[in-house]
Amino acid sequence: MARIIRVGGASSETSWHEALKDLRADDVLMLGPGFYYLPQGLTLTDITIKGTGSVPEDTTIEGYISVSEDSRYVTLENLCINTSTDNNSLFVPVESDGYLTLRNCFVKGNGTDTAAIAVNGKITVELYSTKVINGSVSMYANASFRLEMNDSLIDYKSDKYCALAIEGQGTAIINNSNIHGSINTFAKTNAELDINNSEADYILLHGQTWMNMLNSTVRAKDDSCLYLSDDCWSNIMNSKFNGGVYIDKKTRTIIQNCTINRMVVINEAKVTMSNSMVTAHSDFQDEATCEATRVSFMGNMNYEYFLALSGNAHLRGHDLLLHPNGADLAIQDEAKLHTNVIADKDEKLSVECNKRPNVYILGIQWTAKKK
């Protein structure tokens, strides 16, 4: 039978260490405000721990926690876990098969390459109104996972490590959350990634990743704030990218109602775009193809070309809007452009091309030139 055990505060029934010695499956441990020390860590099996303070930091566990191999669930609520040693704040072993749930928690890693939350095995991880700082949330290669992240924050900006690492097999759902750092998948990843109403600094996808992205923002202004590679499939809607979108290899990408600063598409990547805007520079190379409908390709003085095609790239457009803003359009090598244009700020368009028959633009006066 489940027991409610109170530790700390006026209604305390037992001491912290006595409670730990007598923990049983399905116990609910109620911790009053204060600091609770676990220098050797703690392994939990089918336990719920709740802080009774007004905010998570009122009830702080100094140390680290592991989920046992045979645990069905571990639930933590209204707690702060502060890990100052080189340990995972929360660790899920390979043999696990259960749930790890955090509600209104604050997890502090030690700021090294050690993940704050390390996930292996078969596990559902639920983060609700939870903050993770100074460490990553990492799904490792041997994990079969489901991650649900709602109204939560991961704050781990690093030039070497990502804030949310997704390897292994599973599904990650990120709703109304904020990632200060990068979201990464890897060569061995086989996962679905759903990002809704959220923000991240970078998103870098590899392996076999299926991404659905809605009403979200990627903040970084670097050339690859969004990087799609390998065999990734992506469906992106109503989102904004402050930097560059870089797409390569055999990716398949659908972009709808989005604003992108600049984009580069190479190799055998295929892109379908509609009702979107690229504000500075677009570059299609190699065997890349793009179907674009009601897309605005714009330029600025930072780039020689506002739109460039080379190799055997092919852009087929429908009702495009071209705004060069002083930049040129380049169709090089065997690349082809076939489109009609419905609006343009300039009366004339200058097209740098090697083979005039490879350029078909209807709806605007254009002039071919050689570099």
Description of each model-found segment:
Residues 80-172, 176-179, 185-189:
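Right-handed parallel beta-helix
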Residues 48-51, 73-78, 100-104, 124-127, ...:
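All-beta strand scaffolds that present successive hydrophobic residues in beta-strands
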Residues 321-371:
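Leucine-rich solenoid repeat scaffolds
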Residues 2-32, 37:
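Acidic Gly/Asp/Thr-rich repetitive segments characteristic of extracellular carbohydrate-active
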Residues 4-8, 40, 45-46, 57-65, ...:
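Extracellular beta-sheet-rich ligand-binding/adhesion modules
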Residues 15-23, 36-44, 61-69, 88-95, ...:
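Short, T/G/N/S-enriched strand-turn elements that build extracellular solenoid repeat scaffolds
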Residues 8-12, 46-92, 109-111, 221:
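Right-handed parallel beta-helix/beta-spiral solenoid domain characteristic of secreted/periplasmic
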Residues 2, 26, 46, 71-73, ...:
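A general structural motif
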